[in-house]
């Protein structure tokens, strides 16, 4: 064995993320539904995030695929049933947005309804929430067009890119964009409820998903949630493509057995209907999407003609609002920290009560861009109990 061959073998053994480089995937535009595009896909020159030049598929979709029915999101009253929400506070879990769930939140200090049972519902495209806690139900803008770039030949990155909150994941085969976790109620005080296919409307007026919708019934069954997505459910089918160009499938292999030997991004090299290549799998828990992407994405790979929201190229031109941001910049007993104005009220006092500096507390909680911190791990770093840390942190908004 030559020195070069030996070195490559050692590198392959050292990192599961290097193995897929030898098993490249290629995007097949004909895998998408004919109704996915409002313009025929084009192959164009593009620059990847590592600075290298490449070729990308440029695909353009509308605010919503033709014929796709969405919702419901927010219930009008406690007697109605809305969509779903992945609650990450006390009694964490996936819930239907209904009376039982909203009353539970009320008992925890998050009141989303009036005394007569009317739920606080707000269209943040037209107005900011007037209540401490409101269910967000955004109006659509049928004029919006979305343009995305996907590498024709995926390239493995040196290290995976963590997705965090509202990170760009990819696009489903019906043309709906996919993003990672929606903002937590613990971050903003408000609930951007999802429909039972895991989607909702962005402040810019276009529909997107936060789940693998064609395998979401697997999640509902495991979580004991009485919900169903009207899309055809197939745990072994391809769901879409990630923004790094690698395909995404449901939670099982083609033979119906669970996917095994998955890396931290829930992917591996294996045989698919597209051939043997690296691909991602959905998980059986919500959100059932990859936590990271292993490939290199294209620069400026997502833009919209909207006047608000993610990727908006005409921000502020028609008066649509941006979404509510984390109040005071966090931290809200589990939400992200930091903000333009520095530590929020109560953060320095929390550090003082623990006998540490604000900087030490911030470092223990970790990077705010990664979403809700692991309080148990942060407490362990500080040498205290999780209960002591929770008690010291400022309360969530509106409490």
Model features per residue range: what roles?
Residues 26-187:
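Solvent-exposed N-terminal domain segments of exported/luminal and surface proteins
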Residues 9-20:
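Bacterial N-terminal signal peptides
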Residues 26-36, 45, 260-340, 399:
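Long, compositionally biased interface segments
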Residues 192-199, 261-269, 363-366, 375:
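Short, recurring structural edge motifs at helix starts
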Residues 186-194, 204-258:
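Short helix-loop boundary/capping segments
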Residues 2-10:
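Bacterial N-terminal signal peptides that target proteins for export
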Residues 144-150, 172-176, 202-217, 273-287, ...:
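Extracellular/lumenal glycan-associated surfaces
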Residues 314-352, 362-377, 381, 390-399:
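Disordered, low-complexity segments in secreted/periplasmic proteins that are enriched in proline
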């Amino acid at each position: 064995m030559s020195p070069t061959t030996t070195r490559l073998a050692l590198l392959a053994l050292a990192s599961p993320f290097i193995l897929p480089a030898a098993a490249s995937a290629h995007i097949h535009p004909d895998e998408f539904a004919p109704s996915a595009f409002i313009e025929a896909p084009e192959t164009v020159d593009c620059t990847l995030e590592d600075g290298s030049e490449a070729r990308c598929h440029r695909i353009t979709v509308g605010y919503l695929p033709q014929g796709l029915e969405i919702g419901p999101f927010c219930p009008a009253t406690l007697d109605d049933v809305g969509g779903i929400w992945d609650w990450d506070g006390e009694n964490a879990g996936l819930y239907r947005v209904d009376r039982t769930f909203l009353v539970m939140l009320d008992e925890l200090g998050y009141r989303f309804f009036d005394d007569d049972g009317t739920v606080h519902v707000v269209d943040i495209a037209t107005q900011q929430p007037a209540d401490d806690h409101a269910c967000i139900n955004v109006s659509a803008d049928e004029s919006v067009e979305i343009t995305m770039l996907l590498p024709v030949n995926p390239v493995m990155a040196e290290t995976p890119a963590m997705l965090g909150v509202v990170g760009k994941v990819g696009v489903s085969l019906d043309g709906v964009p996919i993003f990672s976790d929606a903002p937590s109620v613990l971050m903003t005080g408000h609930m951007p409820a999802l429909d039972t296919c895991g989607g909702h409307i962005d402040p810019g007026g276009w529909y997107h998903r936060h789940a693998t919708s064609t395998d979401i019934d697997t999640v509902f069954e495991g979580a004991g949630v009485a919900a169903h997505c009207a899309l055809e459910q197939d745990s072994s089918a391809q769901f879409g493509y990630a923004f790094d160009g690698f395909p995404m499938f449901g939670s099982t292999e083609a033979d119906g057995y669970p996917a095994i030997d998955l890396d931290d991004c829930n992917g591996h090299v294996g045989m698919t209907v597209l051939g043997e290549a690296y691909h991602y799998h959905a998980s059986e828990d919500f959100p059932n999407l990859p936590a990271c992407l292993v490939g290199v994405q294209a620069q400026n790979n997502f833009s919209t003609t909207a006047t608000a929201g993610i990727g908006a190229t005409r921000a502020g031109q028609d008066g649509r609002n941006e979404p509510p941001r984390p109040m005071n910049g966090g931290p809200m007993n589990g939400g992200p920290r930091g903000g333009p104005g520095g530590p929020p009220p109560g953060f320095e006092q929390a550090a003082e009560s623990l006998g540490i500096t604000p900087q030490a507390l911030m470092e223990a909680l970790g990077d705010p861009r990664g979403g809700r911190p692991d309080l148990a791990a942060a407490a362990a770093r500080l040498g205290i109990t999780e209960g002591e840390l929770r008690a010291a942190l400022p309360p969530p908004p509106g409490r």
